[in-house]
Amino acid sequence: MGSDVIGVLGADMRQRRMDSLKISNWILAGLATALSLTAGAGAQTGTTPQAQAPQTPAAAPATAAPQKPAAPLQLQNMGQTPPKADPFPQANPKYFTATTPTVDTVNAFLKALWGYDPNRIWRVEAIQTTPAPNISKVVVFVSDKTPGSKVQPTAFFVTPDEKHAVAGDAIVPFGATPFADLRKTLQARADGAARGATGKDLLLVEFSDLQCPHCKEAQGTMDNLVKDFPNARVVYQSFPIVDLHPFAFKAAAYGYCVQKQKNDAFFVYSAAVFETQDALTTETGDETLKNAVTKAGLDPAAVDACAATPATKDQVNASIKLAQDVGVEQTPMLAVNGHLLPLTGIPYETLKTIVSYQASLDGVSTGATGPAVGSSSVPPTLGK
């Protein structure tokens, strides 16, 4: 994407490096993948290539007054120790031909995504106009503080309203507080069975499918989050993917009817369904769901009748619509105050760090013991 800027760094710098998270394809994951941006703690290291400055594309003449780049090296706000040497080329004003977004906004956006990692460093090297009216191209160089770490170039586009960033086939929220709108949406509309706190200041919403094998695997993670974050409200939100899982919608409908009678019974029901997930077949699926209802202490016949009503089907469809509206494309997915993260592939300690960091950005307490993540001051920048 953008050979005029990235091509000059050479094939070695374009080589993708696997991040320790190994996240798949949305927001943090999607952006990291789409932007070829996978530097992080524990990432592969090697000789740092000679980074070169971006080249202004001929198709994007400088029609606006260049921005003045911010401090040359931006570090994460959790890090206390700056790198021994500045691995990036100095930002050149001639590559800042677009008036929006500002360098400060881009840095705030990237800190929202990556600030949980104290080892990651970057510099915004260009914010350029493009042939598409009011669509800007942002170029960032990223690395980490491990000696000899490679510099990764990446680029993404920002929409005219500065609400979204586009990278490859990923469209993600953009801005200084990119997850704020999704957080408000989920606070208003996430109505699944819930555990933990009654308040929604720290809201963890799990989008899940009862017939999804990866969702079954994620339940231990969700149980741990409930224990480790006492101030979090943890919501199970149904997102049955019926094209892949024929019994998922009916299982979700049963789940809604169980929740309607008794919130806590839902989690007994869902655990029983996950435990017998392989039996959700044409021959044994109905009996499997009824047995799960019985384990939850409710009447299977009453739940079955409730699940068949148009009102219940509308409720499940509304939950699906919510998932689609906030950009969920796979299960299991976790929204941490609006920040969408795939639940599989993230080490639990890393996930805990991200939850704590997002809470610190939003100014809310997690209730967890130990030092607050993201509470340290921003370390000094280099190269002034």
Task: Give the positions of each predicted feature.
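Structural alpha/beta surface segment adjacent to cysteine/selenocysteine redox centers
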Residues: 205-294, 324-329, 357, 361, ...
